[in-house]
Amino acid sequence: MVNSVIFFDITVDGKPLGRISIKQFADKIPKTAENFRALSTGEKGFRYKGSCFHRIIPGFMCQGGDFTHPNGTGDKSIYGEKFDDENLIRKHTGSGILSMANAGPNTNGSQFFICTAKTEWLDGKHVAFGKVKERVNIVEAMEHFGYRNSKTSKKITIADCGQF
């Protein structure tokens, strides 16, 4: 399986912040990577485009991927509502690691987060399946719009997304 590269064009209250590119670890975590890739391209009829990062905690992560509700309560994968943890071999080694958000074992859907720091306490609990390849500074800039209580001060949106 090819390690595809995904792009997100990020806006803050409708103003462009920049484009990040994310390399997936599809060779090791193919099912999770395919879910993220297909949700980025929209080829299954639903996608990340237009969804927001609803939870940003400085020094921890930026979470998004809820395209059914803007508040983090929605979670839909290309395989149905939820799918199992594929493998937990990748570690949350630092800023830029892409991982699945979940509500416990085997509850992956569409929601994901991008780490902004080393988060080793997530190892073995969340599937890390990619890494920001270019423009991690955009993710770090997104942190400035988050609070410790996970709320955001501005609307951080995936204005466009797809596969290179």
From Swiss-Prot:
Record field: catalytic activity: [protein]-peptidylproline (omega=180) = [protein]-peptidylproline (omega=0)
Keyword entries, A-Z: Cytoplasm, Isomerase, Rotamase
GO cellular component, one term: cytoplasm
Gene3D superfamilies xrefs: Cyclophilin-like (2.40.100.10)
Domain PPIase cyclophilin-type: 7-163
Protein's cellular compartments: Cytoplasm
Enzyme class, first EC level, given as a word: isomerase
Entry's transmembrane regions: none
EC number from the UniProt entry: 5.2.1.8
UniProt keyword Cytoplasm, yes or no: yes
Major subcellular site: cytoplasm
A molecular-function term among this protein's GO annotations: peptidyl-prolyl cis-trans isomerase activity
Keyword Cell division found: no
GO terms of biological process kind: protein folding
InterPro entries the UniProt entry points to: Cyclophilin-like_dom_sf, Cyclophilin-type_PPIase, Cyclophilin-type_PPIase_CS, Cyclophilin-type_PPIase_dom
Other information: It is one of six related genes or pseudogenes found in a cluster, thought to result from gene duplication, on chromosome 1.
UniProt family annotation: Belongs to the cyclophilin-type PPIase family. PPIase A subfamily.
Role according to the record: PPIases accelerate the folding of proteins. It catalyzes the cis-trans isomerization of proline imidic peptide bonds in oligopeptides.
Protein name: Peptidyl-prolyl cis-trans isomerase A-like 4G
Organism expressing this protein natively: Homo sapiens (Human)
Lineage, uppermost ranks: Eukaryota, Metazoa, Chordata, Craniata, Vertebrata
Gene: PPIAL4G
